[in-house]
């Protein structure tokens, strides 16, 4: 019950929605949110992946907002981004999380990550990335946990991806629907907006 109330709170979401609107337009739907927890000295690696290999939203019109609940550093497993690889969906492989095959994750099998950049964030800060931006995180090597909240938003005008068919209707609400504001792009893909910045 804590997660939905936090995600829906004005404190947590209003300014982020303004930024999301600049990237995917004024019709915004929350399609997924999750608490992220890397325990001290463990909290293993999350391999390189692109979010839209999970979501499969049409025209790649999805943005992720990662809110830091603790200071996030290289030492405690911050996210790393790979500039220049966000123009297309790369091939992923499905890997099992446990030997019992009770859960799986997706990972890019081979990618040159020599240009990867860490995203260190102060508590209360956030990172925004496009659904085709490759990212990963490494193990927490510190004595403190690393906690965050990930929120994933899609253009509400896009067809529902298959993943939404198994969820209750109110699980993925439209959070904003309004006429475009002056100066808000919204008509171009996020990868085009950010082409010269990443």
Segments and roles (model prediction):
Residues 1-8, 12-13:
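Single conserved hydrophobic/aromatic residue that forms the stacking wall/gate
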Residues 16-81:
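Conserved double-stranded beta-helix
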Residues 37-39, 73, 88, 155-157, ...:
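Feature marks short, surface-exposed loop/turn motifs that line or immediately flank catalytic pockets
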Residues 50-53, 66-67, 113-115, 133-136:
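Glycine-rich, charged/polar anion/phosphate-binding loops
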Residues 94, 126-128, 132-198:
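Non-heme Fe(II)/2-oxoglutarate
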């Amino acid at each position: 019950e804590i997660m939905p109330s936090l995600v829906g709170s004005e404190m947590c979401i209003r300014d982020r929605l303004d930024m999301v609107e600049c990237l995917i337009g004024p019709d915004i739907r929350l399609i997924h949110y999750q608490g992220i927890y890397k325990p001290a000295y463990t909290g293993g690696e999350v391999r390189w992946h692109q979010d839209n290999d999970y979501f499969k939203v049409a025209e790649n019109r999805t943005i992720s907002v990662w809110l830091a609940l603790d200071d996030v550093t290289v030492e405690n497993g911050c996210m790393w981004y790979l500039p220049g690889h966000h123009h297309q969906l790369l091939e992923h492989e499905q890997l099992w999380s446990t030997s019992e095959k009770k859960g799986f994750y997706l990972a890019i099998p081979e990618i040159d990550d020599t240009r990867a950049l860490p995203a260190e964030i102060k508590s209360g800060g956030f990172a925004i990335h496009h659904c085709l931006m490759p990212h990963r995180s490494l193990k927490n090597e510190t004595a403190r946990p690393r906690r965050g909240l990930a929120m994933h938003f899609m253009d509400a005008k896009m067809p529902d991806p298959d993943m939404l068919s198994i969820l209750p209707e109110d699980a993925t609400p439209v959070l904003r629907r309004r006429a475009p504001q002056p100066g808000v792009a919204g008509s171009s893909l996020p990868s085009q907006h950010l082409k010269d910045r990443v």
